[in-house]
UniProtKB/Swiss-Prot annotation:
Lineage: Bacteria, Pseudomonadati, Pseudomonadota, Gammaproteobacteria, Pasteurellales
Top-rank taxon, per record: Bacteria
Name of this chain's protein: L-threonate dehydrogenase
EC supergroup of this enzyme: oxidoreductase
Active site: 177
Function statement: Catalyzes oxidation of L-threonate to 2-oxo-tetronate. Can use either NAD(+) or NADP(+) as cosubstrate, with a preference for NAD(+).
Gene: ltnD
Organism: Haemophilus influenzae (strain ATCC 51907 / DSM 11121 / KW20 / Rd)
Protein family according to the UniProt entry: Belongs to the HIBADH-related family. L-threonate dehydrogenase subfamily.
Length: 301
């Protein structure tokens, strides 16, 4: 199938969803956008989407695929099966790529509901950040049938630099993402703790950042997130509350396996403390603000 004859709707036009949708447009796919935020809808329409809407009723029957990039399982269920859910309007055989971070059990429940409607699910969480999403370079950790992968190949080609086929069982992709989020959350929390200690010890944070990013202690998360701290800019690309949710899923998964997670539990407590202190809607690097007596850079200073 030629790309221009392949129609896809992206539901959830946040930083990752917007990037994925724009990448689909850039790849020549006929692209639709669904979101409750009119500003996001206007932005995607200006980027070349065929149509945008708060729900996809008017164009659902035209779609070959749907990509779900909302925050969690509850939102995924709502946009698919809720009062204004799109699932019942899709034609049989439509592929649904569920990319929200959720527990394996939630992914399996959604898959069962979609199967009952004649729809085909790929359990396909994503990572890489907003910049990579916009360039079509996300990492996708996916599980599902061979048919699901084949039906969604144009979308995967458009949006991803790396696609990992974890297996056929729905829930495997979700579990890999949860383990990944353990590392992501711990890396941010550790980076924040290190920068807070540096500040307390009188080390300029721009100097500390430069040293770490050119030394063995660096990580992708440190380099990406602690730059926000150095700039004093906590405009959210991924919020503190996202990691309250994701590290909660990490701990729930470990609990179900009777498996101890010492570092992840501490990181979860740190993000929860930051959220409780009023920083939940700020960038996740704002977890550094839980440390008292620490002088942090101000934006534009």
């Amino acid at each position: 199938m030629e790309n221009q004859n392949y129609s896809v709707a992206v539901i959830g036009l946040g930083s990752m969803g917007m990037g994925a949708a724009v990448s689909c447009i850039n790849a020549g796919l006929t692209t639709y956008g669904i979101d409750l935020n009119p500003v996001a809808l206007e932005k995607l329409k200006a980027a070349g989407a065929k149509a945008v809407a708060a729900n996809g009723y008017d164009f659902a029957h035209e779609l070959d695929a749907v990509v779900i990039l909302v925050v969690n399982a509850a939102q995924a269920n709502a946009v698919l099966f809720g009062e204004n859910g799109i699932a019942k309007k899709l034609k049989a055989g439509t592929a649904v790529m569920v990319s929200s971070t959720m527990a394996a059990q939630d992914a399996q429940i959604i898959s069962q509901k979609l199967t009952e409607l004649g729809l085909i699910m790929l359990d396909a969480p994503v990572s890489g950040g907003a910049a990579k999403a916009l360039k079509g370079e996300m990492t996708v950790m996916a599980s599902g049938s061979k048919q699901a992968f084949e039906l969604l190949q144009p979308v995967l080609d458009a949006t991803a630099a790396k696609v990992y086929n974890i297996g056929e069982e729905i829930g495997l992709g979700a579990t890999v993402k949860i383990v990944h989020q353990l590392l992501a959350g711990v890396h941010i929390a550790a980076g924040a703790e290190a920068m807070a200690l540096a500040s307390k010890a009188g080390i300029p944070l721009d100097v500390m950042y430069d040293v770490v990013t050119n030394a063995a202690g660096n990580s992708w998360m440190f380099e990406n997130r602690m730059k926000h701290v150095v700039e004093g800019d906590y405009t959210p690309l991924s919020m503190v509350d996202i990691f309250v949710k994701d590290l909660g899923l990490v701990n729930d998964t470990a609990k179900s396996l009777h498996f101890p997670l010492h570092l992840a539990s501490t990181a979860y407590s740190m993000f929860t403390e930051a959220s409780n202190a009023g920083y939940g809607k700020e960038d996740d690097s704002a977890v550094i603000k839980i440390f008292s007596g620490v002088s942090l850079p101000k934006k534009g200073a």
